[in-house]
Regions:
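Long, hydrophobic alpha/beta structural blocks
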Residues: 11-17, 21-324
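C-terminal, beta-strand-rich globular interaction domains
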Residues: 277, 286-378
Length: 378
């Protein structure tokens, strides 16, 4: 799914735009026991409660494509005949009304999910969307629809203890200590089937993970029986390792600055283009950046081999997963320097009297802990 398709579905999660009739789910304690079930009619819930449920489900479609939102791809064999795909289709086709099917799904989550000692809430909703046609100007015509997209959305939310505080009790007309448990933002979730080319794609699901470095592979294994792509954090680490191992001493400050600048430029240009498809960088594109910076061909070939070993032949990478485009950071054992990426060129490396130094020009005023200071010898 691309950004436009995700955004189109996210707009469904408003009281006046969705066709969700019931909310289902269960509350699970830290011992993996179901404490209670949820089976609520959206029509009789107070509006503020209904909106809170919708907001939680909506968050399972939030974040960045390729970072928080990950495509899950089923094989042809799985779609043709597999328990995991059959269960997901049954959830959708039953409109979540079959309690036994829901229970089977809950147990798949409960038996696999590791949230430590946290209690959590599993939420499920079924929706049908009359997909509006688009006119020749790529604008939606709300009065014209030739397809219906039926889907299930799920999210898993930690339930946290609230600290005891004083609260007013109108019946007693007094203040007393009160505590309780609150539902936090979803830790993970998914949409099935995917909404590709504005239509159902039963070969794909869209998985959500709040943390980009912890995508809960254990749940993906249990529910989908597939291997998810590398997390954004894993991609970044693998790319850095491929680069540093291949380049060795040639991996200097100037080269890393140039790579960061080139990738950052690509990210910014992609944002400005409003292209809904994720930005992609091939291994050959990355190798070309090294070549433009005068890296020896032997080291470039070693880098390519490392990338293929890490990511697979023909792999494409998302530059947004490889660098932090919002900052440029230099670390030593005892210090960290963080700069606006546009000014990364200010940092230089020098060897003076046999010692390595990082140099930053200080042409303007200098502050230390808020105090204006002067440089000796000025």
């Amino acid at each position: 799914m691309n950004l436009k398709e995700v955004s189109e579905l996210r707009r469904r999660f408003r009281m006046d735009r969705n066709a969700i009739s019931r909310i289902y789910g269960c509350f699970v304690n830290s011992s993996r026991e179901i404490v209670s079930y949820i089976d609520e009619s959206m029509g009789i819930l107070p509006q503020d409660e209904a909106e809170k449920y919708l907001n939680l489900l909506k968050k399972a479609l939030s974040g960045k494509i390729g970072k928080n939102l990950i495509d899950i791809i089923f094989s042809t064999e799985q779609v043709a005949d597999s328990d995991e795909h059959r269960l997901l289709v049954a959830l959708r086709d039953s409109e979540l009304k079959d309690g036994e099917i829901r229970e089977e799904f809950y147990q798949k989550i409960i038996n696999s999910l590791d949230l430590g000692d946290s209690n959590y809430l599993i939420l499920l909703a079924y929706d049908t969307y009359d997909v509006p046609c688009k006119n020749k100007n790529d604008e939606m015509d709300a009065d014209a629809s030739d397809a219906v997209f039926s889907y299930v959305v799920c999210c898993v939310c930690p339930v946290k203890e609230r600290k005891a505080e004083l609260g007013f009790f109108p019946g007693d007309n007094e203040f007393h200590s009160c505590a309780g448990q609150i539902v936090a933002a979803p830790e993970l979730g998914f949409l099935f089937p995917a909404f590709d080319d504005r239509a159902a794609n039963i070969y794909n699901a869209l998985f959500y993970s709040r943390k980009t470095d912890e995508i809960h592979q254990e749940v993906i294994d249990s529910v989908f029986h597939t291997t998810a792509p590398m997390s954004a954090a894993e991609q970044k680490e693998a790319f850095q390792n491929a680069l540093s191992e291949a380049l060795g001493d040639a991996c200097n400050m100037e080269l890393v600055q140039s790579i960061h600048d080139r990738l950052r430029d690509q990210i910014e240009q992609h944002k400005e283009s409003h292209d809904p498809e994720p930005l992609e960088l091939s291994v050959s594109d990355a190798a070309a950046i090294l070549r433009d910076n005068g890296v020896e061909e032997e080291k470039i070939l070693a880098f390519r081999d490392n990338c293929f070993a890490q990511f697979g032949d023909g792999a494409t990478l998302n530059p947004a997963n490889l660098i932090d485009s919002s900052r440029f950071e230099v670390k030593t054992a005892d210090a960290t320097i963080s700069l606006d990426p546009e000014h990364s060129y200010l940092v230089e490396t020098r060897i003076i009297d046999g010692r390595k130094y990082l140099l930053i020009p200080a042409d303007e005023d200098i502050e230390v802990n808020g105090f204006g200071v002067r440089v000796k010898g000025e």
